[in-house]
Amino acid sequence: MTESLLFRGAKILGADSADILVQDGRIAEIGSGLSAAGARTIDADGLVALPGLVDLHTHLREPGYEASETILSGTRAAAAGGFTAVFAMPNTSPVADSAGVVEQELALGESAGYATVQPIGAVTVGQKGERLAELGAMASSRANVRVFSDDGFCVWDPLIMRRALEYVKAFDGVIAQHAQDPRLTEGAQLNEGAVSAELGLAGWPAVAEESIIARDILLAEHVGSRLHVCHLSTAGSVELIRWAKKRGVAVTAEVTPHHLLLTDELARGYDARFKVNPPLRTQEDVLAVREGLADGTIDIVATDHAPHPSEAKACEWQAAANGMVGLESALRVVHQAMVQTGLLDWADVARVMSSAPARIGSLAGHGTPIAAGQPAEFTLYDAAAAGVFAESDLHGQSSNSPYLGRDLPGKVLWTVHNGYATLEDGVLADRGARS
């Protein structure tokens, strides 16, 4: 039996204040002046209560790359950022292209206890793009996989992509595409534009993303299957998704926090913390993806949390790995880029960071409203706080954050998962997890 928790005075979705009583893993009651014998009472006055955040795009690295991250360390980072569920990308070793690997990941997440870990299955065997992986076996496994991706690699062959879309349609699955034409991005180091030209580095053109998105929209429309576009980053990509939705195509899209805030100007210092795939784009692209998220063209925010050991980033730009950690900072960045700018309110944040990703990923028990009878999956956020993002804010095994030393608003204070507090007043709780 879980501990009873009584949070007093939380502002649900940033609006009316209410008490939240948690008992036996569920929200037992919402109201004012609540009391419950034996419940631990927490002063949540003024804190914004949001449904537990759900990340549809996380790299947890286990099995195979535990020097960068483990499922335990990654879900601790998730809890610190207000997340109660993460979808684990399949670029592990072995690749998550079979029922055995996705079930292993699921079990490791259950053992850790800090957040639900929902595996994403690879589209192709070994993520090599040559033949379909065991999509049906992963879907019918205990992991109940519904999202499939070769993220890190594009499913470039149109015949393979068409067959994947056709296959997952049978069980309402979704193909999450890493939209990158590999021929157009050979040797690319950063966004193709003025900055890449000045630095003399090979550019990653916007059309390399947009051409794959355009092709896959047409394939998804032809097949009548669901397509999800990972880490959309250009103004042209936003227009393509907008066009597809007007046509009634079953397409959804995500944007990362870093593409909502940062630009390729940061590459001028050759600091590899800012090297990522797709690359940071221009200020015009940043404004376009913000607008797309605000008007519903882009469905969700997803972190693309990508931890790397220090030696993979503390090197020359050309040799550095792509990727940034983002679980602990995501909500604060969205607060700065979207809420403080007036583009989203807290109810919108709940949609793009909780209910919509859970819906796209067919994840039951998450993304539910903060209401009596619902699963106790929520986070409490101090929107009035502010501070410099520091290494002490990171709780995974890697520190390749682009926000270190940057002023960010807000602070996640409490995360409740499955009725337990995984984060208590800003401190990770001891879940008795595996070591």
Regions found by a protein language model. Give the residues of each.
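Divalent metal-coordination and catalytic microenvironments
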Residues: 10, 25, 46, 57, ...
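Divalent metal-binding segments
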Residues: 59-68, 87-99, 119-132, 149-160, ...
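Metal-associated gating/positioning segment near the N- to mid-region
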Residues: 45-112
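His/Asp/Glu-enriched, well-ordered alpha-helical/loop segment
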Residues: 198-226, 273, 294-295, 299-301, ...
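Histidine/acidic residue-rich metal-binding segments in metalloenzymes
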Residues: 132-301
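A glycine-rich helix N-cap at a beta->alpha junction
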Residues: 107-123
